[in-house]
Design a protein with these regions (language model features):
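N-terminal targeting signals for export/organelle localization
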Residues: 1-40
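Conserved segment of the thioredoxin-like fold in thiol-based oxidoreductases
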Residues: 37, 87-141
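A short beta-strand-turn-helix
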Residues: 41-63
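Loop/turn elements at helix/coil->beta-strand transitions in domains of secreted/extracellular proteins
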Residues: 58-63, 92-94, 116-118, 149
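Structural cue for short, hydrophobic secondary-structure segments
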Residues: 64-68, 98
């Protein structure tokens, strides 16, 4: 009986850790979003013009919401994959909305230009206090969401070859 209690306690603790992850409830938010309609958010572009995610998502195109920042080394390393996907699939109905966790506007704009990212970019320039962090449970970057033409989140965290593999299936 004592052994059964120890085993059950171990399963309980493992489940609790898996659900809450390192940053509180963000793991719960992340997992619960796949299969759900996207949540709208509104942030300014590089010119200060406000845009809503609903201006792009749920409008008949596949949309990748890409969370990144100019100061993020892994984001810079991942960006060639994202750019290649954009160039390969944009004319077939694929759009990207970049959401930056930057706080310095000059660095943000410079990275967009130097990293060859020709899609729409949004940021409230609030670093980790970015509104998207709470809405989408972003606890690390790079991160992304793939939204189908009807506005349903179908995947999260597609990096490297995984992004192209999924998009090549969609657009074959």
């Amino acid at each position: 009986m004592k052994r059964l209690s120890v085993v059950l306690m171990a399963f309980f603790l493992a489940g609790a850790i898996a659900c809450y992850g390192a940053d509180g409830n963000y793991a719960d938010i992340q997992q619960s979003l796949v299969g759900q309609k996207f949540l709208d958010l509104e942030e300014p572009d590089v010119n200060g013009v406000e845009h809503k995610l609903s201006d792009y998502a749920g409008k008949g195109k596949w949309v990748l919401v890409d969370f990144w920042a100019s100061w993020c080394g892994p984001c810079k390393a991942e960006m060639p994959n994202v750019t290649a996907a954009y160039k390969k699939y944009h004319d077939k109905g694929f759009e990207i909305v970049g959401v930056s966790f930057d706080r310095e506007k000059g660095n943000w704009i410079r990275a967009i230009r130097e990293w060859d990212m020709p899609w729409i970019h949004l940021s409230d320039l609030k670093y980790w206090d970015n509104a998207a962090r709470e809405v989408y449970g972003v606890d690390a970057i790079p991160d992304n969401l793939l939204i189908d033409p009807d506005g349903i989140i179908v995947a999260r965290g597609l990096r490297g070859a995984a992004l192209d593999a999924v998009l090549s299936e969609i657009f074959k």
